[in-house]
């Protein structure tokens, strides 16, 4: 008798995706972050669902409803902090996942890579609208500043901003629609994740050597299910330590002050995972230029498959590109640090240099390094 998981229409899909999937035998722990992102998404949807049961999306009661969740709802404080810190874990995994893709040349799988960029942008949008919901000072002013950037779009900008706000300022209409967006977007993300996996399983996974691994594949279960489970345990441990011991370490103290349109915080800044893009935005004096740089800072990822001219797959055997890669990572950390600093010398200057370097490494230096490495290969 044939095994049910191989014949049943529904189980067959699960079987081909998570059980009998042929997987390269040498993929390292850097390949764990895809499953960890799936885990993060599940945690966020579940905790978010329970928070939505008690939250009210009205300017008069939003802030106090979050306080009510923390004080009066059974384990509400835990659900709230798991959700807030779960977002941080989500973005840590996301950055590592994208960084792995760049390092090992996974961007040659263009469909998977491009849907990944769409996922990244959708996740950023979800996190942004979610940050507005507690209706604290930083929620309100963050929403005001970031949505206002759309006014830089020529001709239709001002109308567009007023249309997104649902009025002439960030108010009740804005909060209500942001809650609606924040509720629906994770399910859209989940749908995109399935498309992401569909495209990935068309070609199979990449591997650290950058060589074709068709001659050496092993089943996903039990080898990688157990490996992913270890990753999940470690992720949950870090998340629990964050949520239970340091719940506010990644948050902003200003968000414990209810939103007040008449009082601007000293330093308006987004959550830590947006700081690199915020630093790039601020480093350009022109408003429209800043907005374009902000958008390009993410969309530049789509250039990787186009700019790739290397004869080798991934950076494993490419020392020059490796050096550039780690400079790029360090530069990204510098941008993250600058994003949280006040707009004054020397921070502005450092931010401008880092922003230029961010784009230069990807668009100019890495392709040049590839050409040099190709030339070196020909010598031997």
From Swiss-Prot:
Domain of life: Eukaryota
Presence of the UniProt keyword Membrane in the record: yes
GO biological process: one example: mitochondrial electron transport, ubiquinol to cytochrome c
Annotated localization: Mitochondrion inner membrane
PROSITE patterns: CYTB_CTER (PS51003), CYTB_NTER (PS51002)
Cofactor: heme b
Molecular-function GO terms, alphabetical: metal ion binding; ubiquinol-cytochrome-c reductase activity
Membrane disposition: Multi-pass membrane protein
Chain positions recorded as heme b b566 binding sites: 97, 196
Binding annotation for heme b b562: 83, 182
Keyword Cell division belongs to the record: no
Record GO cellular component, one term: mitochondrial inner membrane
InterPro entries: Cyt_b/b6_C (IPR005798), Cyt_b/b6_C_sf (IPR036150), Cyt_b/b6_N (IPR005797), Cytb/b6-like_sf (IPR027387), Cytochrome_b (IPR030689), Cytochrome_b_C_euk/bac (IPR048260), Cytochrome_b_N_euk/bac (IPR048259), Di-haem_cyt_TM (IPR016174)
TM region positions: 33-53, 77-98, 113-133, 178-198, 226-246, 288-308, 320-340, 347-367
Binding-site residues for a ubiquinone, renumbered to this chain: 201
Pfam families: Cytochrom_B_C, Cytochrome_B
Disulfide feature: none
Cofactor note as given: Binds 2 heme b groups non-covalently.
Alphabetic keyword roster: Electron transport, Heme, Iron, Membrane, Metal-binding, Mitochondrion, Mitochondrion inner membrane, Respiratory chain, Transmembrane, Transmembrane helix, Transport, Ubiquinone
Family indicated by similarity: Belongs to the cytochrome b family.
Comment field (misc): Heme 1 (or BL or b562) is low-potential and absorbs at about 562 nm, and heme 2 (or BH or b566) is high-potential and absorbs at about 566 nm.
Function: Component of the ubiquinol-cytochrome c reductase complex (complex III or cytochrome b-c1 complex) that is part of the mitochondrial respiratory chain. The b-c1 complex mediates electron transfer from ubiquinol to cytochrome c. Contributes to the generation of a proton gradient across the mitochondrial membrane that is then used for ATP synthesis.
Quaternary structure and partners: The cytochrome bc1 complex contains 11 subunits: 3 respiratory subunits (MT-CYB, CYC1 and UQCRFS1), 2 core proteins (UQCRC1 and UQCRC2) and 6 low-molecular weight proteins (UQCRH/QCR6, UQCRB/QCR7, UQCRQ/QCR8, UQCR10/QCR9, UQCR11/QCR10 and a cleavage product of UQCRFS1). This cytochrome bc1 complex then forms a dimer.
Name by which UniProt lists this protein: Cytochrome b
Organism: Delomys sublineatus
């Amino acid at each position: 008798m044939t095994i049910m998981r191989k014949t049943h229409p529904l189980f067959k899909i699960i079987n081909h995706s998570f059980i009998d999937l042929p997987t390269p035998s040498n993929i390292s722990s850097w390949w764990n972050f895809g499953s960890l992102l799936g885990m993060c998404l599940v945690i966020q949807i579940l905790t978010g669902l329970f928070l939505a049961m008690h939250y009210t999306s009205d300017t008069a009661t939003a802030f106090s409803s979050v306080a009510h969740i923390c004080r009066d709802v059974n384990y509400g404080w835990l659900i709230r902090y798991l959700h807030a810190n779960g977002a941080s874990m989500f973005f840590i995994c996301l950055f590592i996942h994208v960084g792995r893709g760049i390092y090992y040349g996974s961007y040659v799988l263009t469909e998977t890579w491009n849907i990944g960029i769409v996922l990244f942008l959708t996740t950023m949008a979800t996190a942004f609208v979610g940050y507005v919901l507690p209706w604290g000072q930083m929620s309100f002013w963050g929403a005001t500043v970031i949505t206002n950037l759309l006014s830089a779009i020529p001709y239709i900008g001002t109308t567009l901003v007023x249309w997104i706000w649902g009025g002439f300022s960030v108010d009740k209409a804005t909060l209500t629609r942001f809650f609606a967006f924040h509720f629906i977007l994770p399910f859209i993300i989940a749908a995109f994740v399935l498309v992401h996996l569909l495209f990935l399983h068309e070609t199979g996974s990449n591997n650290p050597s950058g060589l074709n691994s068709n001659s050496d594949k092993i089943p996903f279960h039990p080898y990688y299910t157990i490996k992913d489970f270890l990753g999940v345990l470690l992720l949950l441990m870090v998340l629990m330590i964050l949520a239970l011991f340091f719940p506010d370490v990644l948050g902003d103290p200003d968000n414990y002050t209810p939103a007040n349109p008449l009082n601007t915080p000293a330093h308006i800044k987004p959550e830590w995972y947006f700081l690199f893009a915020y630093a790039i935005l601020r480093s350009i004096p022109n408003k429209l230029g800043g907005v374009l740089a902000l958008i390009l800072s993410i969309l530049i990822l789509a250039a990787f498959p186009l700019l790739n001219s290397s004869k080798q797959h991934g950076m494993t055997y490419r020392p020059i590109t490796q050096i550039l890669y780690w400079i790029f990572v360090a530069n990204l950390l510098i941008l993250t640090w600058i994003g949280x600093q006040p707009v004054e010398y020397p921070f502005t200057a450092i931010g401008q240099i880092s922003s230029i370097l961010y784009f230069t490494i990807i668009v100019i230096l890495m392709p040049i390094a590839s050409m040099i490495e190709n030339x070196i290969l020909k010598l031997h």
